[in-house]
């Protein structure tokens, strides 16, 4: 897709990476100008390979791109994806590595919770880098808020199907 104002093609690519035997972390995001930082959650899964992790990162970053475009959030699409076969033992290293990668990007990527990360992880990450968008130090549980939105959509869809509105 071409940005009509800048005439630049907006593509998703790897902005930063860390690879080791126990943990690999990839920041995959759109290459938009600095005034449109990328946004997407930090996902930690037991991917079989780094390639599988990267492929999921590209898929998810493109979905985040569509989401941010649809809702005109001002963000570009991005995702932080991490691979480990021992998820519970790498959490501290994940937070440390991710903070360094985010800091090196100097605000081009902002992350939050996703699969196998929670607000406690985001609070630790936020102590190391300001590039976190989550319900840090809040009484609001962002996961509950997201779940309520999904439930609302399902209820609406169910009602619409019953009334044959589509």
Name each model feature, range by range:
Residues 156-166:
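Single conserved hydrophobic/aromatic residue that forms the stacking wall/gate
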Residues 1-140:
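N-terminal ligand-binding/catalytic initiation module
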Residues 61, 153-155:
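Short, well-ordered amphipathic alpha-helices
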Residues 52, 56, 149, 157:
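Charged catalytic carboxylate motif
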Residues 137-153:
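A glycine-rich, Thr/Ser-enriched phosphate-binding loop motif common to dinucleotide/cofactor-binding enzymes
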């Amino acid at each position: 897709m071409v940005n009509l104002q800048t005439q630049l093609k907006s593509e998703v690519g790897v902005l930063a990476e860390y690879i080791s035997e126990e943990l690999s972390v990839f920041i995959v995001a759109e290459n938009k100008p600095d005034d449109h930082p990328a946004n997407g959650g930090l996902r930690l899964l037991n991917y079989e390979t780094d390639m599988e992790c990267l492929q999921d990162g590209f898929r998810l970053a493109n979905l985040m791109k569509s989401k941010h475009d649809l809702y005109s959030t001002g963000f570009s699409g991005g995702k932080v994806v991490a691979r480990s076969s021992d998820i519970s033992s790498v959490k501290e290293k994940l937070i440390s590595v991710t903070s360094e990668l985010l800091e090196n990007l100097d605000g081009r990527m902002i992350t939050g919770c996703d699969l196998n990360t929670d607000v406690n992880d985001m609070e630790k990450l936020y102590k190391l880098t300001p590039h976190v968008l989550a319900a840090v130090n809040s009484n609001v549980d962002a996961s509950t808020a997201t779940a309520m939105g999904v439930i609302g959509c399902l209820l609406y869809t169910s009602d619409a199907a019953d009334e044959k509105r589509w």
